[in-house]
Amino acid sequence: MQRRSRGINTGLILLLSQIFHVGINNIPPVTLATLALNIWFFLNPQKPLYSSCLSVEKCYQQKDWQRLLLSPLHHADDWHLYFNMASMLWKGINLERRLGSRWFAYVITAFSVLTGVVYLLLQFAVAEFMDEPDFKRSCAVGFSGVLFALKVLNNHYCPGGFVNILGFPVPNRFACWVELVAIHLFSPGTSFAGHLAGILVGLMYTQGPLKKIMEACAGGFSSSVGYPGRQYYFNSSGSSGYQDYYPHGRPDHYEEAPRNYDTYTAGLSEEEQLERALQASLWDRGNTRNSPPPYGFHLSPEEMRRQRLHRFDSQ
C-alpha cells in the first residue's frame, strides 16, 4: 500500500488543529507522547507499509517479529492517521486521568503487542479452519486494534447510557460490537480480525486475567496510581477541568481548563465522527482509483505484490 502523495495532508492538519484547540498542556503526557509518536512515524516511516504490516506469513513463519512493534505505529494515509489519533485523544484524556500516566503507558504498550498477537492467532485459526492460506498472507497496519481495546476499557469504567451509531441508539456495553460490524460493512477494506483482536484484548483486561497478570509483572505500581492531589472531571453539562483533592480542606477548589469541543468537532460526538468517517470512506472509494481505503489498515496479498512491482519499476 502506498501513501497518497498528492496535495496537502488535510487529515494531519486537522489532527494538529484538534490537538492545539484542546491545548497541549491539557493533554496528559502519555497520551500526548502516543500522538506525537504516531505522527512522527507517519512523517518519517521506518519502513514501507508492506515491510511493517502484520501477517502470519511474515511475522510467524519468517520470524519477522519486529512487525509486532511497527504495525500499530504506521498508517495508510493522513485520514487513517487522523481518525485513529482523534479517537486516541479523547480515550487517552479519559483513561489516563483515571489510571494514571505510568499505568496507562503500560496498558498502551501491552495492548499494542497483544492486539498483534491475538490478530495473528485469529488469522492462523481462520486459515487452518477454512483451509485458506491467503489468510496467513493478509497484512494489517494501524492503531485501530489498540483503540478498540481502549474503547472496551472506557465503556467498562463508564457503564450505562447509549451512543448514537449510524443514527441508532446503542447501549454502551454493545457499542464496540456494533462498531466492529458497521465498520466492516461500510468500509470492507478494513481488517475485521484486527478490530476483533482489540475487543478481545480489552475483554481479557476487564473480564479476564490480563489485568492481574500485568499487575503481577509490574510489581512496584498498579492501576490505582493517579495524579497526586489533582483529579480530572467532566460532566454531562460540558464543563470540565482539574480539581485539587485535599483530604483536610479546600475540596471544592478547581482550576478551569477550557475545552470548547464544538469549535473543532462541529458538535459531533465520537460515534457521529465515526459515522462521518464511514460515509467519507464510501465517497472517497467511489471517486478515487488505485488508492488504498482511507481508514482501513488491511493489505491483501495482491496489493502487496502490486506494491513490490511498483517499487521495482520506479527504481
Curated annotation (Swiss-Prot):
Its EC number is 3.4.21.105. Changing residue 144 to A: Enzyme inactivation. Reduces the cleavage of BIK and TSAP6. Increases TSAP6-mediated exosome secretion. Signal peptide: none annotated. GO terms for cellular component: endoplasmic reticulum; endoplasmic reticulum membrane; endoplasmic reticulum quality control compartment; mitochondrial membrane. Residues 1-21, 128-138, 202-315 are cytoplasmic. Induction: Up-regulated by endoplasmic reticulum stress agents that induce the unfolded protein response (UPR). One of its GO terms (biological process) is negative regulation of apoptotic process. Intramembrane-cleaving serine protease that cleaves single transmembrane or multi-pass membrane proteins in the hydrophobic plane of the membrane, luminal loops and juxtamembrane regions. Involved in regulated intramembrane proteolysis and the subsequent release of functional polypeptides from their membrane anchors. Functional component of endoplasmic reticulum-associated degradation (ERAD) for misfolded membrane proteins. Required for the degradation process of some specific misfolded endoplasmic reticulum (ER) luminal proteins. This is Rhomboid-related protein 4. It comes from Homo sapiens (Human).
